[in-house]
A protein has these predicted regions:
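Glycine-rich phosphate/diphosphate-binding loop of Rossmann-like nucleotide-binding domains
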Residues: 65-165
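Flexible, charged surface loops at secondary-structure boundaries
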Residues: 163-167, 186-188
């Protein structure tokens, strides 16, 4: 992975930079990946340039809270949306998170701290559901052990498509793009959708859900 990262940086170094285009970590990458990227770019330019990437380790100029920032931002936006539509954020509010990872985990933890009930989460293997709420601490430890959610005990396995169609209040697609489309948007029952991934709703889905009054 290090060799691949450094070669990739070498090949694109002329089109990135602090004042042009700044790479950031995403699926399959982490702070170490970004450190390799920054180091390679700096070697090519002849001096240290921390600003070429975000998501670096703190030791080489990274920012405190960067890893959780997107997920916390999603939770903040959910609270704002709930206030706008008059939804009281308490245990009766149910949440499903499609993508229990770098964005989904901090979003889930923050929203649970706000008092809502996270009833479903998912990863690439599928989803899990518990109408009384997922044990998030247990779930975090489970995925940190590099295990699939579908194998976690004490919950009901569901598919990712079933998660999207749950009768819930808040849906957070926080995995990949193109998750909610013209083919499945009619199945979505959530009152609020907070996009934690890049483009998880297609244009058709956004238009159709807006007409239904989804915030």
């Amino acid at each position: 992975l290090q060799s691949l990262t450094r070669r990739y940086c070498t090949e694109i170094n002329m089109i990135i930079g602090p004042s042009t285009d700044i790479p950031a970590p995403d699926i399959g990458t982490d702070a170490q990946t970004m450190a390799w990227f920054m180091d390679t770019y700096s070697q090519l330019k002849g001096y240290t340039i921390p600003g070429v990437v975000t998501g670096k380790p703190i030791a080489v100029g990274g920012s405190l809270g960067r890893a959780e920032a997107t997920g916390k931002g999603v939770a903040f936006c959910v609270n704002f949306a709930a206030e706008k539509i008059g939804m009281k954020m308490d245990k009766n509010v149910t949440v499903a998170i499609h993508g229990f990872g770098k964005v989904g985990i901090p979003a889930a933890l923050d929203l649970a701290a706000d008092g809502v009930t996270v009833v479903a989460i998912s990863d690439v293997s599928g989803g899990v559901y518990n109408k009384n709420g997922i044990d998030l601490d247990k779930a975090v430890k489970w995925v940190e052990g590099r295990r699939f959610l579908k194998d976690m005990p004490g919950v009901t396995p569901i598919s990712n498509e079933e998660l999207l169609a749950l009768d819930i209040d808040i849906l957070i697609p926080a995995a990949i793009d193109g998750v909610v489309t013209k083919d499945n948007c009619d199945n979505v029952k959530a009152k609020i959708i907070a996009e934690g991934a890049n483009g998880p709703l297609t244009k058709h889905a956004i238009e159709a859900l807006s007409k239904k009054g989804v915030f």
